Regions:
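Aromatic/acidic polysaccharide-binding cleft in carbohydrate-active enzymes
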Residues: 56, 64-65, 265, 456, ...
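Noncatalytic carbohydrate-binding groove/subsite architecture in carbohydrate-active enzymes
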Residues: 214-218, 225, 334, 376-545, ...
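Carbohydrate-binding surface patches
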Residues: 627-668, 674, 716-719
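Solvent-exposed strand-to-loop "edge" motifs in beta-rich extracellular domains
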Residues: 164-168, 206-208, 592, 650-652, ...
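Extracellular and organelle-lumenal recognition/adhesion modules and their flexible linkers in secreted
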Residues: 30-295, 312, 328, 378, ...
Length: 727
């Protein structure tokens, strides 16, 4: 995940939520362009079949960005539960003004003293975990201790957990879950005599009422002092530590794989600290995002997450501050037999059966100036090669992916200018072309190459502006504002997929061995982003991502893996509930009907897409994304048994568009079924606690003949029963 100055593109909000605000003045879709023909025709050739859709087509990526994982997936209710931060009454106690509900829930909470600050001491003498543990000094009958507020509680819900304590025999400790004022606004557990050594005590609560201002208090009276090693509180219905609501929804999305750990975080990640008893894993400061990580969701928890969701893991190793030895040992921990040193450690941690993780990515965005441990390409390929050899020595069966960056990434994202190249433009196979660098210098030491892309709404890249160093609203040089129609807005991110495909085909031309060795591309980070954030994904964004999916399905010969940023951006989430948002609804729609094993077929038409207006490097791109059915976007595929033909049609205009369908190589033998995803307008969205504004409805198609009436502002999946045409 790219890093930027904190003031640029409301960074944390964009990365945590990947939400796109509505663009003022573009609430309604526009009519179809006048230049398109009155009668749009599409011809599907069922005899021209591409390789099947990979089971990894709709994968997910998530990063340890501040509290993102811990709010959305992990069920722990307490922040800093192992006390990295000093506990004082100072510092901000409320979120800054203007923070929306969705962003507010991702802000980290702090512990505060109960009573004067002087009675809470961060003691470095024999800490339970990390550098210190809080010591609470006591003063007879006046309670002293610590408190964390801002907890969301549900009335009647049970909560379980534990606390690790030690102290003097004269200390009397109470732990309270607080939901209101007075003695009736809390449930208190009295801990018995404290031992000299740290001991774990169970916690069980039931909240009588619901509140978003709940708290946990740990206080003591008596004489001497007591120390708190760690504390944990989760809803009792957690599933192996994870939220049951978000897990259940994510199981429905046919993700194929989840990439974790990954992102900028991984370049400062010590995987050794993320295994073993959770209470004893040290909390650390993640320097990539300048935030504390508890290490609670570590390597074994990631495997549990994948099992619960029903997907495969994909691990990125630390090639920033990390080394080949630790990466190889990480492979051994995950995949090694119990007879190996790290396999035995995994078994002692409760997981005797090897995980057999297949996909491994060496490094995250090593080309980026933002990446911790960055070095030049000529040195990094040496590092990659060392990592690859060491990791394959441990497990020769793993699939290794190199972290590439094509000329579009280097040019459009401003990386070349950051490196002070003489020419801002990055030609193919120049010293700044990382993807070509692997093809030249790491051949045989990777099976696939990763590519990341983030397309930005409301701006376009201009090479001349970039050369002059012009910056717009803190973005990299070269981005200039642009007025877009809705159709242009919706089509924009799919053009980035298409550009990646054109570049890949150029590499295949220069390096023919790529095809023979089945070298594949993985877009294992991608998103459509914009400045600011409001209320999250909507129908307009779903239309854009549908065109992204369609473009991905046109390149199944080499684009075999993709991972959406972020995986939980498919959900609308509150602290106590979650629903599929429009992103999630779209992933489910395509996973259900255009998923693994489907066979894309050739599509032609009579209405070409507009040509590119910009060619930032080497004349690329040559064409734009989409089918020749403008303003519609159409992709088609046969079912694995070839008994059904499925069409995905995206209509971002405000009118129904007639589409005349011709099928070659097969004949339609029965009634057509339509799954239609739409809403009342482009801002329609699905939110927690509200009736869904965007739905997928199964519709019987009544049109006679071969003309389909494609509904306005909709994503439409048509399925036709087919049989081979007689010869």
């Amino acid at each position: 995940m790219k890093g930027m100055d904190p003031m640029r593109i409301t960074r944390i909000a964009t990365l945590c939520l990947m939400v796109i605000p509505a663009v003022p003045g573009l609430v309604h879709a526009q009519a179809a362009a006048a230049s398109s023909p009155k009668k749009i025709e599409v011809t599907v050739d069922a005899a021209q079949v591409s390789p099947p859709v990979s089971k990894y087509e709709y994968g997910m990526f998530i990063e340890h960005i501040r509290t993102l994982i811990y709010r959305s997936l992990w069920a722990e209710m307490l922040d800093d539960r192992k006390f990295y931060h000093p506990i004082t009454s100072g510092g901000p106690k409320a979120p800054p003004g203007g923070v929306t509900r969705r962003f507010r829930m991702f802000l980290s909470r702090r512990w505060r003293p109960v009573g004067p600050d002087a009675f809470v001491v961060m003691d470095t003498e024999q800490p339970f975990v990390g550098e210190h543990s809080p010591r609470i000094d006591l003063d007879s009958s006046v309670p002293h201790g610590i408190r964390q507020g801002g907890l969301t509680l549900v009335g009647g819900k049970r909560y379980t957990g534990h606390i690790v304590l030690r102290g003097n025999s004269g200390a009397r400790v109470k732990v309270s879950l607080v939901w209101g004022e007075g003695p009736n606004g809390r449930q208190t557990i009295t801990i018995g005599a404290l031992p000299v050594a740290y001991q774990e005590f169970p916690l069980r609560f039931t909240s009588r009422v619901g509140t978003s201002e709940g708290a946990l208090e740990i206080t003591g009276t008596g004489s001497g002092s007591f120390r708190i090693g760690a504390v944990s509180v989760m809803p009792a219905d957690n599933v192996d530590g994870f939220r049951p609501d978000t897990i259940a929804l994510l199981r429905r999305l046919h993700s194929g794989f989840w990439r974790l750990p990954g992102g900028n975080f991984v370049s400062d990640f010590n995987w050794y600290d993320s295994v073993g008893p959770r209470d004893k894993r040290p909390p650390i400061l993640d320097h990539a995002w300048n935030a504390v990580q508890s290490n609670d969701v570590g390597m074994d928890e990631f495997m549990t997450l994948c099992k619960l969701i029903g997907t495969e893991p994909y691990i990125t190793v630390n090639a920033g501050f990390g080394d080949a030895h630790s990466a190889a040992e990480e492979v051994e921990y995950m995949n090694g037999a119990v007879s190996t040193r790290l396999g035995a450690l995994r078994a002692r941690n409760g997981h005797p059966v090897p995980y057999h993780v297949k996909f491994w990515n060496i490094g995250n965005e090593p080309y980026g100036p933002w990446e911790l441990g960055r070095t030049d390409l000529k040195y990094y390929v040496l590092k990659h090669n060392e990592f690859a050899r060491a990791m394959r020595k441990v497990d020769p069966s793993i699939v290794l992916l190199a972290s590439g960056a094509m000329p579009d990434e280097e040019t459009i994202e401003g990386i070349a200018s950051e490196l002070h190249l003489k020419d801002y433009q990055v030609p193919f196979c120049s010293d700044a072309d990382w993807t070509c660098g692997y093809l030249k210098h790491s051949w045989g030491l990777f099976d696939g190459i990763t590519e990341h892309w983030y397309s930005r709404a409301g701006v376009r890249f201009d090479l001349e502006a970039a050369k002059k160093g012009k910056r717009y609203q803190g973005m990299e040089a070269g981005y200039v504002p642009v007025k877009q129609t809705v159709l242009q807005w919706v089509r924009k991110p799919s053009n980035r997929v298409h550009l990646k495909a054109e570049e890949w085909q150029e590499y295949e031309r220069r390096f023919p061995g790529m095809i023979k060795k089945h070298i594949f591309m993985s877009n294992d980070e991608y998103a459509y982003t914009a400045r600011g954030f409001r209320e999250g994904p909507n129908l307009k964004l779903a239309l854009a991502y549908a065109m992204v999916f369609n473009e991905m399905l046109r390149h199944t010969d080499f684009l075999r893996m993709t991972a959406f940023t972020m995986g939980v951006s498919t959900l609308d989430i509150s602290p106590v509930a979650a629903v599929l948002n429009t992103n999630g609804l779209l992933f489910k729609l395509y996973g259900d009907h255009m998923g693994a094993g489907m066979l894309p077929v050739a599509v032609t038409g009579n209405s070409p897409q507009p040509l590119p207006e910009q060619h930032p490097f080497d004349g690329f791109p040559h064409t734009n994304a989409g089918s020749p059915t403008y303003p519609l976007d159409v992709v088609a595929a046969l079912s694995p048994d070839r008994k059904h033909l499925t069409l995905s049609v995206v209509n971002a205009t405000d009118s129904a568009v007639p589409l005349t369908l011709h099928v070659n190589g097969a004949r339609v033998t029965g009634k057509t079924t339509l799954w239609k995803m739409t809403g009342k307008d482009l801002n329609a969205a699905n939110r927690v606690g509200q009736s869904p504004q965007v739905q997928v409805k199964k519709v019987a198609v009544t049109e006679a003949g071969n003309v389909l009436s494609v509904p306005p502002i909709s994503v439409d999946i048509y399925r036709f029963p087919v049989a081979p045409r007689p010869q």
